[in-house]
C-alpha cells in the first residue's frame, strides 16, 4: 500500500530552495517595485475570526501594530511556498521590530487544509506565523472582505489545484489596508514599506 505523503513533506525541498534563493539574492535585490499602497477608505480588509491550533483567533486580539496576511493552500505546488518564504524574509528583515508585526497564513482550501495542516505549514516558514482555517462559509466571507480570488481546477475531489490571487496584505491594527505586495515587489522594498508604518 502506498503511503500518502503530506503537503509539507512533499514540498519541503521546494520550501528550502525558496528560502535559500531569497537569502542569496537579498543583497542584490535593488530593483525598486513599489508595493500597491492602500487608499483611505479602500474596501479591502476588516477583522475576522478563524480557527488556529490554539482555538478561535480574532485578528483584533493580536496586539501587534501591523499584520501581514497571505491567502493560499498547503497543497500549492509553487506560488504559496515562494510567497510565504518571502513573507518570512520580510519578517526577519525587520530585526527587533518584528515583534510588532504578526504573520498569518489563511487557507483558501478548507476542505483539505485542517487547522493542524495550516499550522504546521505556516510554522515551517516562520515559527511565529499562525495558520488559519475554518468552514467554507467563513473562509469565503474573509476572502470577499479581502477581495481574494480562488477557484478549484480539476475534477478529482481529492487531487486538484486551486487557482488563486497572490498578494501579501499589510494591515494595521484596525485591519485597514496599508499596502499590497505583489510577487514582483522585491524584499528590501517590502521591508522599507513595513517600517514606514511602524
Model-predicted regions and their roles:
Residues 1-49:
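N-terminal targeting signals for export/organelle localization
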Residues 43-44, 65-66, 163-165:
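Short, small/polar residue-rich loop motifs at catalytic or cofactor-binding pockets
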Residues 48-67, 91-94:
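A short beta-strand-turn-helix
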Residues 60-83, 87:
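Short active-site neighborhood of thiol/selenol oxidoreductases, capturing the structured segment around
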Residues 68-69, 103, 168:
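Hydrophobic beta-strand anchors of alpha/beta hydrolase catalytic cores
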Residues 84-142:
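Structural microenvironment flanking redox-active thiols in thiol-disulfide oxidoreductases
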Residues 138-193:
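Thiol/disulfide oxidoreductase modules built on the thioredoxin-like
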Residues 197-198:
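Short, hydrophobic alpha-helical segments
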